[in-house]
Amino acid sequence: KSVKMIITILEKNGYEAFAVGGCIRDTILGRQPQDWDITTSALPQQVKALFNKTLDTGIQHGTVTVMMSRVGYEVTTYRIDGEYNDSRHPDTVEFTSNLIEDLKRRDFTINAMAYNPTVGLVDAFDGIGDLERGVIRCVGNAMERFSEDALRMLRAVRFAAQLGFSIERETQEAIAGLAGNIKKVSAERIQVELVKLLTSPNPGELKVAYRTGLTAVFLPEFDMMMETPQNNPHHCYSVGEHTLKAIEAVPADKVLDRKSTRLNSSHYSRSR
């Protein structure tokens, strides 16, 4: 109701506004969205003028948090991103009045859909088709998307694990080609994605990170495990495969058990 109210207020004042991103993906899949993001043609100061309680959470990038019933909803102006020299944030941001230009900058097609009750679903990059096919695919050029934010490579693997999807060929090839860039990402951001992956319904997808060269950079111990046979007639898997099988044997809803089974985070390391 709060999301609909925010969109309605923006529209009544002459602006476009849509729910966007993961909340749309999850709603289509019948999953409960963790949060709701709104994108709008209104500039940050225009958004602030329409609502009683707002927070400048990322105003330099066009984001204002609107508070409704003590819950925050991020409202971000349509934007075009400049270069990403830190492999995380754009150096410059240009606001635009064009929704499609805003959707172009997003990571994966399944996260680049927008919806409001007036217009309906806006799906310029066949996100619905990729949801139906069970595919993780970058919006536009995969090399460009991963060069903008190297964490997106691990996010692709994490989404595949959470949703039971496969990674589209060109997207996976781009990960393999740019895997070394993951060293530019902080250990904290990587660990968040890694924990989400290992506590997903398909933790074995970590093998995709191994095959594409990602774990060689941020978790070289796992590569050693994958390449170490047990030399035991009772164990047909490598140490790495055996570890993943053990993790998979723990139900996904037993998060604490999963975390105790996985590689201890205190041993988490990265090589540069």
Language-model-detected regions and their locations in the chain:
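Catalytic cores of the polymerase beta-like nucleotidyltransferase superfamily
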Residues: 1-272
